[in-house]
C-alpha cells in the first residue's frame, strides 16, 4: 500500500474552515456546507483543515474528502476516490487517486448516492489507516 497523504495540522474544528464557509455573498459555499457537515458527522475521529483553499475532512490527519467552490460549481471530492464503488456514476476525474462530484445550482443531486460516497470514503480511509499500522 502506498504512503498515505497526511495533514498533521488537522483539528477537531478549524476556525479557518468556519471562516471560509462564513464568507459573505458566496452562495456556492452555502451550497457546499451541508456536504462538509456530512463529512464531519462520519465519526468522532474526523478532523479538518483548510487545505489549498478547500475545506478538507480527515480521519486523524489522513484526508478522505473535501468541498471546494469554483466560479459556477461546487466539488465534493475524495482523496482516494478511485477506490470507491460508484454505482450511480457520480464521480468525475482522471487523476491517479482523486475523484469528485460536481454540483451546480438548479441541477438535481442524487442525495442518497452522494451520502453513500461520503460514508464509503470515510470507511476507506479508516481501512487504509488500520493497514498502515
Where do the language-model regions lie?
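Charge-dense, helix-prone N-terminal extensions
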Residues: 1-133
Amino acid at each position: 500500500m502506498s504512503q498515505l497523504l497526511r495533514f498533521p495540522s488537522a483539528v477537531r474544528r478549524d476556525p479557518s474552515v468556519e471562516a471560509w464557509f462564513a464568507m459573505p455573498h458566496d452562495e456556492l459555499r452555502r451550497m457546499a456546507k451541508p456536504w462538509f457537515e456530512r463529512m464531519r458527522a462520519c465519526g468522532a475521529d474526523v478532523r479538518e483543515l483548510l487545505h489549498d483553499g478547500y475545506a478538507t475532512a480527515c480521519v486523524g490527519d489522513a484526508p478522505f474528502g473535501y468541498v471546494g467552490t469554483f466560479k459556477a460549481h461546487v466539488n465534493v471530492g475524495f482523496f482516494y476516490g478511485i477506490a470507491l464503488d460508484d454505482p450511480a456514476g457520480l464521480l468525475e476525474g482522471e487523476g491517479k487517486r482523486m475523484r469528485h462530484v460536481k454540483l451546480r445550482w438548479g441541477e438535481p443531486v442524487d442525495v442518497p448516492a452522494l451520502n453513500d460516497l461520503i460514508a464509503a470514503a470515510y470507511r476507506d480511509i479508516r481501512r487504509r489507516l488500520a493497514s498502515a499500522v
